[in-house]
């Protein structure tokens, strides 16, 4: 007994023509017995990091390049290594086996069979076998050889040597003596190699005929050739004899790619077929045997009997056999996955251990045992009553048959073989097939047909000679007999005329194609023409005498070489190389409306790809240019020699160019491969559909199949490869009276196998066909359809960086590229952190321990622990699902590196009855919650930065999916869809206006707003005559009002005008409602609907006018009617939208909050629907909303109000308003009793998203001017104090664009069908259907980009809710609390503790979102810890983020989230930033003064729309410093010149800003006495208000320029700095000191002071006071620092310290709110659009002026 492992060899074939055309790279390398598989070239970082796979085998055959003689392994080498060893074992009496494994086209058949010039393993083995027999045979030793040849296809065994053909399938039985065997398999005796060759040739012909008749793919069948060698040994002396019997099995397995390839949605179920069962089971058997050999499972069950193949090969796998395996692989990169699968398969197989024994003298023993069994069975049969006689009888017949076969003499076997060979020859001759074994190498003088087959082993194997009159058909009387789908009993005739002309005449209803063109009349044939009969009988005609050289010359003269079709191409060569694929492609291209759908698809995709490529390359070039510019700026001449700088720039430039080139090459490569794949798939799909339709029509199944297009599920994920084709063919199966099912190509392939079997049984009238039919189910249409993919929801995981919970309703994108509902998910980080160093540079290659954390153990050694992160995924519910797929919905996803998919099942409570309402079908609840622990690596960080968690949502079709499509429920769904569509492009924002007046305490306090029923503006402001006023404008987003990603960045300008007086009794009140933009939206919407209606009318008319309507036409008509009805509903929605429908212009269906107007005006941004980009620069006079004028606004004059300050916590601006500039009698006098004053406040805001643009918002306000409140009014005010309102507002609905789906003429499903059908006609705009569909499908990229943006903004909102430090207004759904803030802070300062006084600085727009993405304590050695920061007069000049040290690398998709100001640095500044000094040296002071003179030259900011008016500029006495904003170069100069921290700036308003120093507050001494607290003033400008007591001199307009002096240090928390006054101080020397501040002031809890809170005036905390003493000025500001100094625990407002609330308490506390202000009498700038009169003529009539609601 010999225990040996299975020998495994691997052979790599040369590149084929297709791979050479695609320029694919070779990824396989062989050295000795090692095979190295390199990862294919990829444009992702993960691809670059993949290591090569190394495998070791017994033999590695390099057959790539024949010219490399030292390395090349030919057929002879393969035979010597494998064949000779097998042959030797066979002669020793061992069983032996060789099986070839690999994907289709990898060279299995070539290795096993070869061809005439290069014989393969089997012919060489047989030849060597008989050569050795000839040498060794003598008197004492004789040899007998028998062969059998069978095919296993779809779990059925067919005898290829059977003369009756291989139609009948044989049964596999297992005998306890013989083991598994095939009952009835021919075992023929042979005496020479020629006999074997003849039998194999005839067997292959039978196989070809059967495969062609049934249209089976021979590459999907297994062929087993058995050679049984019997050695008889004679002892001449004693006369005894003994036998050795060995069986050699040569197995050519089916193509393995069916198993290794997985479908788009994970491993697709192989439905309805056993085609892959054998290979799958073989893999399981090999794995089980490998585990047994490794000692893992000695008793592990080996599933031999699960498939016919493994059952028959039981002895060869792990049993009594010497087995070798040859694995054939492709070297091409595009076959990487299949190659890897094959190598892994072979790697496991080499571990199998077989136990071979010599089979000595088995016959005598077998015969004896069989005879004993026969006697026992006869006895049982006569005696047994309990057992059923038929079973025993069958067993008895089986054993007797075996005995008979074993006792047949050798001579009888030879006679039987001869008789079978003659019968087969007669049968082949009757079919018209030549018996020549040499294939098509026949006489030169004969005309013949040769078959074309996809399998190279069967191609051109059958030769049919033509007579003068040849009849072709299925009837036995025909000269050439063909059987199969579409072949008529009498199909066609071929005639050869006397002059040599050959013609083909098809019969009626007999499908005949010549060169792909369907022919109905007599057609002349030429040499090389391709003929198709029926569905799948392809032939090529060979006419040796008629090569038509003369005719070709004439043809070439007449036809341009550039423009000839396939027909001409076929005639261009006398010896054309036309294979099966060419003929098949030719038929498909010419059958479908004589058009090439594949070419259309390819052309459209190529055109769009080139456009994308050009755009992307341009963007790439600009990006690299920006990088180079930054490098040039960083390389200062002082630091580096000029030569090194230029070298570095040259190198950078070269590297940038290389990157662009490499990126373009990789993208081109991927695109070429994708196009080739799409072409193959479309050809294949059309072929399969044609055959399925033939079968269904023949068998009257009332089922129709057609090709449609869909997006592969893998391409709906954000993790997909970029540049891949985003569409794939799919099959629509439709049965009359039933719904439509969508099948994959693989599914139809598998179904077709059962269809063919059923068809064959139906043709042969097999009585058990019905029984088999019932058992298998109907392969034409599924009664119980399996689950369908509803769509894929992409959850971007950036929130794991930020440690915030992402709660979001993720859109589910369907395979037609539409949103098919929303999945409500929650993703959060439970434990673990993102490491700082890795976060800073997750691509650093020099850190070997990047995925671990350094920890010092007890012994002092540094050990590395793996960093872990736990994140939780919760799936709550799916809403808005399509009603047809809302049965049994479940979710499936794979998180990061998890091996298995996670399935989330829906919540089903059997006790609760399902609700009957229609809406219930739209929502499915889940209770899925799962935690994942992952190791933090660079790859994982890259995944959460760039990738997404793709959750697939699956569902089953509802039972009533065949109901009429325009039912009421369907219309409800349409309305819901309409709401969802508009929800994606709309967002609401509120504009609140309040007016502040100077009160008796010197504070600006909000005036009251009296509300009344007849007031439409929200209320009437009660203004006191002659008081100084300010206007405060606040812009807020409205939560849950739409999913448009809207970001209001800042208020740019505030203007006021259009003063109108109205009678309360005689005239209607005015408000802020206008319909300019709403009318524009409705007009655009109506235009789109009119286009669709015209198109639908035309299509319906076209279909209706058809005299004979096909099934397709009727369904098309039904779909058109459905769309027409839906269009009517949509048109109604345009004109009369239902209240609360979410459609712009819908009647207000809400109760507005106090002060809010009821009606909601619309503003239309008119952005590009694809990517929400603006077609032009929407700034200044082109800003959105400029022309959205209100009634009575025509020709009115507006005045620009200087902005005093911006708010830190929201987008809010306070502007000074001097009402006298209007020169209006109505504003200067007390308002009469029955009169009301109306004004319009116009606010220009900066949007950063959805596009960088300016937006003009208008709010009409009503005012009443009084002199003094009467006693009654005063009493009323006190009684109703609680309900007093101080601000009024209006809600705007912002519409970015018309929903894209509205403009689509066909629904996506129909468009996909029309595109796949490749209809010639175009749509109204000249585009073809395929172009429309492809453009629509390519929008998935945009959907994902916008979704990335929406989720990123949601994360930022979550951050702002968690800690109020983001100073911008963010607006997206799913977050309840929004922190709106001002983006123009000037810098960032830190105190001794190493944490910032500012909550956060977002002025550093050049840095990425990472600056605010994480929290963490700033390291003590941070370069930003020094007190002397880098000041900047430019708010955006900072280039280093304060959070750089502990935030992750910016995700690539966060670039668009940066404020647009960084991109528009050349725009006029919003405001200037003067500097606060700390303890300056004289030199620094001089530098400062020099810079300040420079800055004086710049002008204050004026919006572009006011450029035509005189600039408002206050005249300031003795003012040397004019606040302004310098450009970027001044910023850099200033950073270099001065080294200190900046603070809030004064604004270019002509007013002074009250600023206190925030420099080292914790270092200042505080006296312990009750004397006044002191705080230094270092600002260059201080605005002083008049305190109660002795008045100050009126020229208090300048602050001291003296350097700060520190008074001393104390132990208390509150510190002061005293500043000595100059001689020309604003305070007179005799000014007495005000009263001390109460002691409570010094005991206030500490907190972080925001820069803007240092402004004097109505501050937020209300603890700001000023005291003036002789000789010095002190300003006190009490800071509030958290007791716990950990920056990570700072919670801001969410901790309950609501600082805003403290401001209200400060009224009536004069000692705490002393303000020194001196308002100069400034005039505003009159503002009026230059073209206002031209665009909008003045309307006098009240009725015209009032907007219609």
Curated annotation (Swiss-Prot):
Subcellular location: Golgi apparatus membrane; Cytoplasm, Cytoskeleton, Microtubule organizing center, Centrosome; Midbody; Endosome membrane
UniProt function note: Plus end-directed microtubule-dependent motor protein involved in intracellular transport and regulating various processes such as mannose-6-phosphate receptor (M6PR) transport to the plasma membrane, endosomal sorting during melanosome biogenesis and cytokinesis. During melanosome maturation, required for delivering melanogenic enzymes from recycling endosomes to nascent melanosomes by creating peripheral recycling endosomal subdomains in melanocytes.
InterPro entries: FHA_dom, Kinesin-like, Kinesin-like_KIF1-typ, Kinesin_assoc, Kinesin_motor_CS, Kinesin_motor_dom, Kinesin_motor_dom_sf, P-loop_NTPase
Keywords: ATP-binding, Cell cycle, Cell division, Coiled coil, Cytoplasm, Cytoskeleton, Endosome, Golgi apparatus, Membrane, Microtubule, Motor protein, Nucleotide-binding, Phosphoprotein, Protein transport, Transport
UniProt protein name: Kinesin-like protein KIF13A
Record field: transmembrane: none
A biological process term (GO) from this entry: regulation of cytokinesis
Ligand binding (ATP): 102-109
Keyword Acetylation: no
Organism: Mus musculus (Mouse)
Recorded family membership: Belongs to the TRAFAC class myosin-kinesin ATPase superfamily. Kinesin family.
GO MF terms held by the record: ATP binding; microtubule binding; microtubule motor activity
Region (Disordered): 633-652, 834-853, 1370-1402, 1417-1436, 1584-1665, 1698-1749
Segments forming domain Kinesin motor: 5-352
Key word Membrane present: yes
PANTHER family listed in its UniProt record: STAR-RELATED LIPID TRANSFER PROTEIN 9 (PTHR47117)
All copies of domain FHA, residue ranges: 469-519
Coiled-coil stretches noted in the UniProt entry, renumbered to this chain: 359-431, 552-775, 1086-1126, 1475-1499
Biased composition (Basic and acidic residues): 1421-1430, 1719-1741
Pfam families: DUF3694, FHA, KIF1B, Kinesin, Kinesin_assoc
Phosphoserine PTM sites in chain numbering: 636, 1274, 1441, 1477, 1481, 1524, 1600, 1650
SMART domains from the UniProt entry: KISc
